[in-house]
């Protein structure tokens, strides 16, 4: 609400809004009563409380059956979080009328209609990829009544319209189509026009993500990466997103800024100082895993750490570089898993935002993975806006929607640094494995 009011205060007329697009952090749980009131604070994506519940469900439902139908372990995802509420907060669970994702809740507040999307069901581990329908067997295992699950529609297309309450609150005309809805990572891929099999998107915010589109139903037997329904999926033209999520990436960089630099440096200056140190950070290494259980490490949490600090050699600049290298190492670790499943990220597209604003990070990631990195003039907000316009018919084709998308920069691997970074990566892997023993 505050953001929309800020836009209106800058002279933009809300009457000019022709459609609404919504993007949100994936996997969060919102529980509503019959009056549409939240019953408890949302349990967000990186909250690890449901890990054991998800592991129990995988074995109880049957590992082979579960992976064949949902392509994922129930893990720490939304359905498992709701099962945690049922087990630990029965009074709250008894009052739930509908549960939904954070983006679904925003759509509800704007429209008065409780709904979700097929892509949303898949990120909750409530979609049966084999049967192309809701995975009621997961809900049944958890004791979740089917009537608690909202009706599901498409991601790109009008599934709801704003109501009079939203018009009174925000000024957006009642009846405006809500014509796009996607979790932050499918939306990031959409914002980069990553829609076809073989295309790969990445982002480096609080968490780091690599998202590869495929037309094949694929599951990682260890659930280190996950498969979800992409925004342009249909039964006749299947599109799935294989998602690598690393919880501890940008949040590590921001922690260093707060606690090491005491916020005396902005990110641009941090990047400049980091670049003054040679590749490999002269033996200093950073493990960034301190933001909850890591899926790519089989839901283990080795914690964050600064390794090999030499008080006579290393400076703040070394810590800054080692942090970005450690984050890039974590991307490399996950991308190797994706390659084992047939995803070949020879080209990685990213928006000019977050960690990808750092020339050092871009170059290090390219060198470690051997991939060409392409930087574009887009972000998640532009993606949701384009999706809304496409879904409402303002744009008639995808080509029209992305006509203004421009490639800003291409980064190729730096062969001169490859051997040093490979040596640093191998030492980093040994440290991570030691922490998981």
Regions found by a protein language model. Give the residues of each.
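Short linear loop/turn motifs
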Residues: 150-158, 270-273
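Short, glycine/charge-rich flexible loops or terminal/linker lids adjacent to PRPP-binding catalytic cores
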Residues: 47, 160-165
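Active-site core segments that coordinate phosphate-bearing ligands/cofactors
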Residues: 14, 51, 58-113, 120, ...
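Short beta-strand to alpha-helix junction loop
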Residues: 128-131, 155-159
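Active-site phosphate-binding/coordination module
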Residues: 8-82
